[in-house]
Amino acid sequence: QANDRFFVLQEDFFNYNPTYVYLLVLWSYLFPQMGALTAVKSIGVVLDLAGAYWIFRWVSRGMNQRSIDRAGSSTTNVTDRTSPAQPPLRSRPAIAAVTLLLTPTVILNSSYWGQCDMGYSMAVLAGLYGLSYGAPRWGLVGLTLGLALKLQAVFTYPLLAVLLLQPRSSLRWSHLWVIPVTYLATLVPAAIAGHPWLHLLTVYWRQFNTYDRLTLNAPSIYQWFPQADYTAFTRLGLLLSASLTLALIWHLVRRYDRFTPPQLLQAALGFNLLLPWLLPKMHDRYLFSAEVLALTLAFFRPRFLPVAIATVVISLGSYAPYLLGREIIPLRGLAIGLGVVGIGVWRDLLGPVSQVNRFQQKTPES
Protein backbone atom coordinates (compact mmCIF):
# COMPACT_ATOMS: atom_id res chain seq x y z
CA GLN A 1 0.00 0.00 0.00
CA ALA A 2 2.95 2.28 0.55
CA ASN A 3 4.09 1.73 -3.05
CA ASP A 4 1.03 2.95 -4.95
CA ARG A 5 -0.58 -0.48 -4.92
CA PHE A 6 -0.70 -1.56 -8.58
CA PHE A 7 2.74 -0.22 -9.44
CA VAL A 8 4.28 -2.24 -6.65
CA LEU A 9 4.26 -4.97 -9.31
CA GLN A 10 7.24 -3.34 -10.98
CA GLU A 11 9.38 -3.97 -7.92
CA ASP A 12 11.61 -7.04 -7.59
CA PHE A 13 10.39 -8.22 -4.19
CA PHE A 14 8.92 -11.62 -5.10
CA ASN A 15 10.58 -14.77 -6.44
CA TYR A 16 7.43 -16.40 -7.84
CA ASN A 17 4.89 -15.77 -10.54
CA PRO A 18 3.02 -12.47 -9.92
CA THR A 19 -0.45 -14.07 -10.00
CA TYR A 20 -0.61 -14.29 -6.22
CA VAL A 21 0.67 -10.72 -5.90
CA TYR A 22 -2.32 -9.63 -7.99
CA LEU A 23 -4.55 -10.98 -5.24
CA LEU A 24 -2.60 -8.98 -2.65
CA VAL A 25 -2.99 -5.84 -4.76
CA LEU A 26 -6.71 -6.51 -5.19
CA TRP A 27 -7.08 -6.96 -1.42
CA SER A 28 -5.34 -3.62 -0.84
CA TYR A 29 -8.05 -1.94 -2.92
CA LEU A 30 -10.96 -3.87 -1.42
CA PHE A 31 -9.80 -3.75 2.20
CA PRO A 32 -7.42 -0.78 2.54
CA GLN A 33 -7.46 -0.87 6.36
CA MET A 34 -6.68 -4.59 6.63
CA GLY A 35 -3.32 -5.54 8.10
CA ALA A 36 -0.81 -7.35 5.93
CA LEU A 37 -0.88 -10.64 7.85
CA THR A 38 -4.66 -10.66 8.00
CA ALA A 39 -4.83 -9.98 4.26
CA VAL A 40 -2.49 -12.86 3.46
CA LYS A 41 -4.41 -15.31 5.64
CA SER A 42 -7.83 -14.15 4.44
CA ILE A 43 -6.80 -14.73 0.83
CA GLY A 44 -5.85 -18.26 1.81
CA VAL A 45 -9.26 -18.79 3.41
CA VAL A 46 -11.05 -17.52 0.30
CA LEU A 47 -9.00 -19.95 -1.80
CA ASP A 48 -9.98 -22.73 0.62
CA LEU A 49 -13.63 -21.92 -0.04
CA ALA A 50 -12.96 -22.04 -3.77
CA GLY A 51 -11.36 -25.45 -3.31
CA ALA A 52 -14.42 -26.61 -1.38
CA TYR A 53 -16.60 -25.40 -4.24
CA TRP A 54 -14.69 -27.47 -6.78
CA ILE A 55 -14.67 -30.65 -4.74
CA PHE A 56 -18.43 -30.10 -4.30
CA ARG A 57 -18.76 -29.77 -8.10
CA TRP A 58 -16.73 -32.92 -8.68
CA VAL A 59 -18.65 -35.08 -6.24
CA SER A 60 -22.03 -33.62 -7.19
CA ARG A 61 -21.38 -34.40 -10.86
CA GLY A 62 -20.38 -37.92 -9.93
CA MET A 63 -23.55 -38.39 -7.92
CA ASN A 64 -25.66 -37.18 -10.81
CA GLN A 65 -24.09 -39.76 -13.09
CA ARG A 66 -24.48 -42.39 -10.35
CA SER A 67 -21.30 -44.10 -11.41
CA ILE A 68 -18.80 -43.21 -8.71
CA ASP A 69 -18.53 -46.57 -7.00
CA ARG A 70 -17.47 -48.50 -10.10
CA ALA A 71 -15.03 -47.09 -12.65
CA GLY A 72 -16.40 -47.67 -16.12
CA SER A 73 -19.75 -49.15 -15.00
CA SER A 74 -22.85 -48.36 -17.01
CA THR A 75 -25.11 -45.92 -15.22
CA THR A 76 -28.04 -48.24 -15.78
CA ASN A 77 -26.37 -50.94 -13.71
CA VAL A 78 -25.38 -48.81 -10.76
CA THR A 79 -27.68 -48.64 -7.78
CA ASP A 80 -27.52 -46.57 -4.63
CA ARG A 81 -25.41 -48.81 -2.41
CA THR A 82 -25.02 -46.46 0.51
CA SER A 83 -24.16 -47.95 3.86
CA PRO A 84 -23.21 -46.63 7.30
CA ALA A 85 -19.62 -46.42 6.01
CA GLN A 86 -20.65 -44.32 3.00
CA PRO A 87 -22.53 -41.00 3.27
CA PRO A 88 -25.87 -40.87 1.41
CA LEU A 89 -25.53 -39.78 -2.20
CA ARG A 90 -27.41 -36.51 -1.80
CA SER A 91 -25.32 -35.31 1.12
CA ARG A 92 -21.97 -36.58 -0.11
CA PRO A 93 -20.96 -33.41 -2.08
CA ALA A 94 -21.56 -31.17 0.96
CA ILE A 95 -19.74 -33.61 3.23
CA ALA A 96 -16.81 -33.62 0.79
CA ALA A 97 -16.62 -29.81 0.83
CA VAL A 98 -16.76 -29.60 4.62
CA THR A 99 -14.22 -32.40 4.97
CA LEU A 100 -11.77 -30.50 2.78
CA LEU A 101 -12.21 -27.30 4.81
CA LEU A 102 -11.67 -29.17 8.09
CA THR A 103 -8.62 -31.12 6.93
CA PRO A 104 -5.79 -30.24 9.38
CA THR A 105 -3.26 -29.37 6.70
CA VAL A 106 -5.77 -27.12 4.93
CA ILE A 107 -6.37 -25.18 8.15
CA LEU A 108 -2.66 -24.99 8.96
CA ASN A 109 -1.62 -24.06 5.43
CA SER A 110 -3.92 -21.07 5.00
CA SER A 111 -5.24 -19.84 8.33
CA TYR A 112 -2.09 -20.47 10.38
CA TRP A 113 0.89 -20.51 8.03
CA GLY A 114 -0.45 -17.95 5.55
CA GLN A 115 0.36 -20.08 2.50
CA CYS A 116 -1.68 -20.27 -0.71
CA ASP A 117 -1.25 -23.88 -1.79
CA MET A 118 -5.00 -24.25 -2.12
CA GLY A 119 -4.85 -21.72 -4.95
CA TYR A 120 -2.95 -23.93 -7.37
CA SER A 121 -4.60 -27.11 -6.06
CA MET A 122 -8.05 -25.64 -6.63
CA ALA A 123 -7.04 -24.60 -10.14
CA VAL A 124 -5.74 -28.11 -10.85
CA LEU A 125 -9.01 -29.59 -9.58
CA ALA A 126 -10.99 -27.20 -11.79
CA GLY A 127 -8.77 -28.02 -14.77
CA LEU A 128 -9.21 -31.75 -14.33
CA TYR A 129 -12.96 -31.20 -14.12
CA GLY A 130 -12.92 -29.53 -17.53
CA LEU A 131 -10.77 -32.29 -19.00
CA SER A 132 -13.08 -34.95 -17.57
CA TYR A 133 -16.36 -33.45 -18.68
CA GLY A 134 -15.86 -32.29 -22.25
CA ALA A 135 -14.34 -28.83 -21.82
CA PRO A 136 -10.66 -29.42 -22.63
CA ARG A 137 -9.81 -25.79 -23.37
CA TRP A 138 -11.20 -24.64 -20.04
CA GLY A 139 -9.42 -27.56 -18.45
CA LEU A 140 -6.12 -26.29 -19.81
CA VAL A 141 -6.95 -22.79 -18.58
CA GLY A 142 -7.41 -24.19 -15.08
CA LEU A 143 -4.18 -26.17 -15.13
CA THR A 144 -2.27 -23.17 -16.49
CA LEU A 145 -3.66 -20.87 -13.81
CA GLY A 146 -2.49 -23.44 -11.30
CA LEU A 147 0.99 -23.28 -12.82
CA ALA A 148 0.83 -19.49 -12.74
CA LEU A 149 0.22 -19.67 -8.99
CA LYS A 150 2.72 -22.37 -8.03
CA LEU A 151 5.23 -24.48 -9.92
CA GLN A 152 3.96 -27.56 -8.07
CA ALA A 153 1.01 -27.67 -10.48
CA VAL A 154 3.47 -29.20 -12.94
CA PHE A 155 3.13 -32.51 -11.05
CA THR A 156 -0.18 -32.96 -12.89
CA TYR A 157 1.14 -32.09 -16.34
CA PRO A 158 2.35 -35.59 -17.34
CA LEU A 159 -1.33 -36.46 -17.46
CA LEU A 160 -1.71 -34.12 -20.44
CA ALA A 161 0.71 -36.29 -22.42
CA VAL A 162 -1.45 -39.32 -21.66
CA LEU A 163 -4.64 -37.55 -22.73
CA LEU A 164 -3.06 -36.30 -25.95
CA LEU A 165 -2.03 -39.83 -26.90
CA GLN A 166 -5.30 -41.53 -25.99
CA PRO A 167 -7.40 -42.04 -29.14
CA ARG A 168 -10.73 -41.37 -27.43
CA SER A 169 -9.69 -38.46 -25.23
CA SER A 170 -11.34 -35.07 -25.80
CA LEU A 171 -7.96 -33.30 -25.56
CA ARG A 172 -6.31 -32.55 -28.90
CA TRP A 173 -2.94 -31.12 -29.92
CA SER A 174 -4.78 -28.15 -31.40
CA HIS A 175 -5.91 -27.19 -27.89
CA LEU A 176 -2.39 -26.67 -26.55
CA TRP A 177 -2.19 -23.02 -27.61
CA VAL A 178 -4.31 -22.32 -24.53
CA ILE A 179 -1.37 -23.03 -22.21
CA PRO A 180 1.13 -20.38 -23.42
CA VAL A 181 -1.58 -17.80 -24.09
CA THR A 182 -3.08 -18.20 -20.62
CA TYR A 183 0.31 -18.20 -18.91
CA LEU A 184 1.51 -15.11 -20.75
CA ALA A 185 -1.78 -13.38 -19.96
CA THR A 186 -1.06 -13.79 -16.25
CA LEU A 187 2.21 -11.88 -16.73
CA VAL A 188 0.76 -8.92 -18.63
CA PRO A 189 -0.41 -6.83 -15.63
CA ALA A 190 3.02 -7.02 -14.01
CA ALA A 191 4.67 -6.14 -17.32
CA ILE A 192 2.34 -3.15 -17.73
CA ALA A 193 3.33 -2.02 -14.23
CA GLY A 194 6.96 -2.05 -15.39
CA HIS A 195 8.31 -5.44 -14.34
CA PRO A 196 10.87 -6.75 -16.90
CA TRP A 197 9.55 -9.52 -19.15
CA LEU A 198 12.76 -11.55 -18.86
CA HIS A 199 12.47 -11.54 -15.08
CA LEU A 200 8.85 -12.68 -15.29
CA LEU A 201 9.57 -15.48 -17.76
CA THR A 202 12.50 -16.90 -15.79
CA VAL A 203 10.98 -16.76 -12.32
CA TYR A 204 10.66 -20.52 -11.89
CA TRP A 205 14.20 -21.15 -13.09
CA ARG A 206 15.49 -18.77 -10.41
CA GLN A 207 13.19 -20.37 -7.87
CA PHE A 208 14.54 -23.82 -8.71
CA ASN A 209 18.08 -22.60 -8.03
CA THR A 210 17.25 -20.86 -4.75
CA TYR A 211 18.06 -23.84 -2.50
CA ASP A 212 20.91 -26.31 -2.66
CA ARG A 213 19.40 -29.06 -0.53
CA LEU A 214 18.05 -32.39 -1.72
CA THR A 215 15.00 -32.08 0.52
CA LEU A 216 13.49 -29.34 2.67
CA ASN A 217 11.51 -31.46 5.15
CA ALA A 218 9.76 -33.27 2.29
CA PRO A 219 9.02 -36.98 2.90
CA SER A 220 11.05 -37.96 -0.16
CA ILE A 221 13.58 -40.72 -0.79
CA TYR A 222 16.40 -38.26 -0.04
CA GLN A 223 15.58 -38.43 3.66
CA TRP A 224 17.51 -41.70 3.53
CA PHE A 225 20.59 -40.09 1.98
CA PRO A 226 21.40 -37.11 4.22
CA GLN A 227 25.08 -37.08 3.28
CA ALA A 228 24.59 -37.60 -0.45
CA ASP A 229 26.40 -35.42 -2.96
CA TYR A 230 23.99 -32.64 -3.89
CA THR A 231 24.92 -32.22 -7.55
CA ALA A 232 25.14 -35.93 -8.36
CA PHE A 233 21.91 -36.85 -6.59
CA THR A 234 20.04 -33.89 -8.07
CA ARG A 235 20.92 -35.08 -11.56
CA LEU A 236 20.16 -38.69 -10.68
CA GLY A 237 16.81 -37.71 -9.16
CA LEU A 238 15.79 -35.68 -12.19
CA LEU A 239 16.78 -38.52 -14.53
CA LEU A 240 14.97 -41.14 -12.45
CA SER A 241 11.83 -39.00 -12.21
CA ALA A 242 11.78 -38.28 -15.94
CA SER A 243 12.39 -41.91 -16.90
CA LEU A 244 9.72 -43.30 -14.61
CA THR A 245 7.24 -40.62 -15.68
CA LEU A 246 7.73 -41.51 -19.34
CA ALA A 247 7.32 -45.20 -18.54
CA LEU A 248 4.07 -44.55 -16.68
CA ILE A 249 2.75 -42.39 -19.52
CA TRP A 250 3.48 -45.24 -21.94
CA HIS A 251 1.72 -47.81 -19.74
CA LEU A 252 -1.32 -45.58 -19.24
CA VAL A 253 -1.68 -44.98 -22.98
CA ARG A 254 -1.44 -48.71 -23.67
CA ARG A 255 -3.90 -49.50 -20.91
CA TYR A 256 -6.64 -46.88 -21.43
CA ASP A 257 -7.96 -45.41 -24.65
CA ARG A 258 -9.75 -42.87 -22.45
CA PHE A 259 -10.24 -42.20 -18.75
CA THR A 260 -13.43 -42.14 -16.77
CA PRO A 261 -13.48 -39.18 -14.33
CA PRO A 262 -12.42 -41.32 -11.33
CA GLN A 263 -9.60 -42.85 -13.37
CA LEU A 264 -8.41 -39.38 -14.38
CA LEU A 265 -8.39 -38.33 -10.72
CA GLN A 266 -6.48 -41.47 -9.78
CA ALA A 267 -3.85 -40.93 -12.47
CA ALA A 268 -3.44 -37.29 -11.40
CA LEU A 269 -3.11 -38.43 -7.79
CA GLY A 270 -0.52 -40.99 -8.81
CA PHE A 271 1.72 -38.35 -10.39
CA ASN A 272 1.20 -35.96 -7.46
CA LEU A 273 2.35 -38.66 -5.05
CA LEU A 274 5.20 -40.03 -7.13
CA LEU A 275 6.98 -36.86 -8.26
CA PRO A 276 7.34 -35.18 -4.83
CA TRP A 277 8.70 -38.50 -3.58
CA LEU A 278 11.34 -38.85 -6.29
CA LEU A 279 12.29 -35.30 -7.23
CA PRO A 280 15.07 -33.48 -5.38
CA LYS A 281 14.62 -30.08 -3.72
CA MET A 282 11.04 -30.76 -2.63
CA HIS A 283 9.48 -28.84 0.28
CA ASP A 284 7.27 -29.95 3.14
CA ARG A 285 4.09 -28.51 1.56
CA TYR A 286 4.45 -30.15 -1.85
CA LEU A 287 1.94 -32.92 -1.12
CA PHE A 288 -0.91 -30.43 -0.81
CA SER A 289 -2.42 -31.08 -4.24
CA ALA A 290 -2.11 -34.82 -3.63
CA GLU A 291 -4.21 -34.39 -0.48
CA VAL A 292 -6.92 -32.51 -2.36
CA LEU A 293 -6.98 -35.09 -5.15
CA ALA A 294 -6.98 -38.00 -2.71
CA LEU A 295 -9.93 -36.57 -0.78
CA THR A 296 -11.86 -35.97 -4.00
CA LEU A 297 -11.15 -39.50 -5.21
CA ALA A 298 -12.19 -40.96 -1.86
CA PHE A 299 -15.68 -39.53 -2.32
CA PHE A 300 -15.87 -41.15 -5.76
CA ARG A 301 -14.43 -44.47 -4.62
CA PRO A 302 -14.74 -44.91 -0.85
CA ARG A 303 -12.13 -47.67 -0.89
CA PHE A 304 -9.57 -44.88 -1.42
CA LEU A 305 -10.39 -43.32 1.95
CA PRO A 306 -7.33 -44.96 3.59
CA VAL A 307 -5.18 -43.43 0.83
CA ALA A 308 -6.61 -39.98 1.55
CA ILE A 309 -6.09 -40.35 5.30
CA ALA A 310 -2.53 -41.62 4.85
CA THR A 311 -1.67 -38.78 2.47
CA VAL A 312 -2.95 -36.17 4.94
CA VAL A 313 -1.08 -37.78 7.85
CA ILE A 314 2.18 -37.94 5.87
CA SER A 315 1.82 -34.33 4.76
CA LEU A 316 0.92 -33.18 8.27
CA GLY A 317 3.94 -34.97 9.69
CA SER A 318 6.22 -33.15 7.26
CA TYR A 319 4.89 -29.79 8.52
CA ALA A 320 6.12 -30.48 12.06
CA PRO A 321 9.85 -29.72 11.69
CA TYR A 322 9.13 -26.20 10.42
CA LEU A 323 6.08 -25.34 12.53
CA LEU A 324 7.14 -27.09 15.75
CA GLY A 325 10.89 -27.22 15.35
CA ARG A 326 11.00 -31.00 15.71
CA GLU A 327 9.84 -34.20 14.06
CA ILE A 328 6.69 -35.78 15.46
CA ILE A 329 6.99 -38.71 13.07
CA PRO A 330 10.49 -39.35 11.66
CA LEU A 331 10.74 -37.99 8.13
CA ARG A 332 12.42 -41.22 7.05
CA GLY A 333 9.34 -43.12 8.15
CA LEU A 334 7.08 -40.67 6.34
CA ALA A 335 9.16 -41.18 3.20
CA ILE A 336 8.56 -44.92 3.41
CA GLY A 337 4.86 -44.31 3.94
CA LEU A 338 4.62 -42.02 0.93
CA GLY A 339 6.36 -44.60 -1.22
CA VAL A 340 3.94 -47.31 -0.10
CA VAL A 341 0.89 -45.10 -0.75
CA GLY A 342 2.14 -43.98 -4.16
CA ILE A 343 3.04 -47.47 -5.30
CA GLY A 344 -0.34 -48.72 -4.10
CA VAL A 345 -2.20 -46.11 -6.15
CA TRP A 346 -0.21 -46.96 -9.27
CA ARG A 347 -0.52 -50.69 -8.74
CA ASP A 348 -4.29 -50.34 -8.54
CA LEU A 349 -4.38 -48.21 -11.68
CA LEU A 350 -2.09 -50.44 -13.74
CA GLY A 351 -2.92 -53.82 -12.20
CA PRO A 352 -4.52 -56.80 -13.98
CA VAL A 353 -7.86 -56.25 -15.66
CA SER A 354 -10.30 -58.42 -17.50
CA GLN A 355 -9.47 -58.75 -21.18
CA VAL A 356 -13.17 -58.27 -21.90
CA ASN A 357 -13.79 -54.62 -22.77
CA ARG A 358 -10.22 -53.86 -21.79
CA PHE A 359 -10.31 -50.08 -22.02
CA GLN A 360 -13.56 -49.69 -20.15
CA GLN A 361 -11.82 -50.99 -17.08
CA LYS A 362 -14.03 -52.75 -14.58
CA THR A 363 -12.71 -52.41 -11.06
CA PRO A 364 -13.97 -54.22 -7.99
CA GLU A 365 -16.85 -52.64 -6.21
CA SER A 366 -15.68 -49.96 -3.77
Residue ranges and their predicted role:
Residues 1-22, 26-31, 195-203:
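Extracytosolic helix-loop segments that constitute the early lumenal/periplasmic catalytic or substrate-binding loops
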Residues 203, 207-278:
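Aromatic/glycine/proline-enriched transmembrane-helix motif characteristic
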Residues 200-219, 250, 268-269, 297, ...:
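Transmembrane helical bundles and short interhelical boundary loops of multi-pass, membrane-embedded
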Residues 75, 92-129, 140-152, 179, ...:
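Membrane-embedded helix bundles of polyisoprenyl
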Residues 42-66, 75-78, 243-254:
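Transmembrane-helix motifs of polytopic, lipid-linked glycan transferases
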Residues 54, 119-136, 293-294:
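Specific aromatic-rich, kink-prone transmembrane helix
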